[in-house]
Amino acid sequence: QGNGLVPGLLTLNFRTAPDLFVWGNAGVPLKIRYRYPAGTWINFSESRLDVSINNSYLRSLPLTKTGMVQQVKDIISPDFVMNEQTVRVPPYYVFGQNQLQFYYDLRPVKVGECQDVLPNNIQESIDPDSTIDLSKTERFASLPNLAFFVNSGYPFTRMADLSDTAIVLPDQLTSQDIETYLDLMGMMGDSTGFPVVRSTVVTANSVDQVSGKDLIVLGSIANQPLITKWADNSKLRVEGGHLRVGMTSPLDRVYTVLDPNAAQERDRVDNLLVSQGDNLAAMIGLQSPLNSSHSAVIITGSSPDKLLTVINAFRNRELNPSIQGDLMIAGAGRVTSFRIGNEYSVGYLPALTKLRWWLGNSPLILILFTLIGVLIVALVAYWLLRRLAMGRLQSRSAP
């Protein structure tokens, strides 16, 4: 609720997992019931209610003399108008932690210089019956996506208590490892609004016991053996105690031919990793090497204190939006993100929708299917025309 002609920003915070999926441009329906003053003093044609989410503008709603919810208006007071509008929210505007923002801009009727007469108590509000309906969305996402992880802890926070998550710590713990672990669990709890009470903590030697869980691996390159063991799964490798881009496979070489920029991007990533030397602080997202239906995130560095550099990048509001893809390198007050590995999907889509999504994300396959379809149509047309031609010839040659 606000007061005055321009009451300032009215906000509402809400949390959800960031894996919302809506096919096409349908969006998520946000039904807004909003109340504002009635009277001859207000210029309804110029007044409006601006609606945004997470600082992204959605739509301006009109303020009319009579509301669409007239029966509610009569019950409340004849001095107020209750209106209702539905705004479609694009799913890519919805994150883990969200804020709906409403900005009333009331304009009075201009009578003359210094002659405007305004009521003493001008109030506006958003009705508590307003809703945002997420029930028609699917839960589906392409991973790895470190932006999901740093903003909402996804996919680990799918279970608020992290009961489906295991944290893999080094055998030889340092104070920085423990601090990183505690900071990270605090951030997870802040994302869900629930304490992390059911996560599992293991060391690298026992990681096979938690193969059915999503994994967060902590430790420096030297202290955490899983980094060397699992680097290949993220198109990386450990060489001489340093992280490097992995050797190209035959399939990678085929993609390089189709996309000449791929080789340049690989070189750029490798050069940046080499330039970090003993100051590397990095985070890697990948499909769990132990179970293809689960995910893993590795927070590592050249030394244990570099893990805290990664955590500090999470907390920095200026750096946080730059964390994306499946590899993030932090240092010198900046972060650089890349996508170097393969994507995989989590969640569920109906079969037809998933096929459309897959084709939409695989343009080469779509072109191939189109060519095959054209070829089939051409062959069928040729066969039909040939039969018609043969039929005509036979009818002409008949006595």
Residue ranges and their predicted role:
Residues Q1-P399:
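Solvent-exposed alpha-helical segments and adjacent loops
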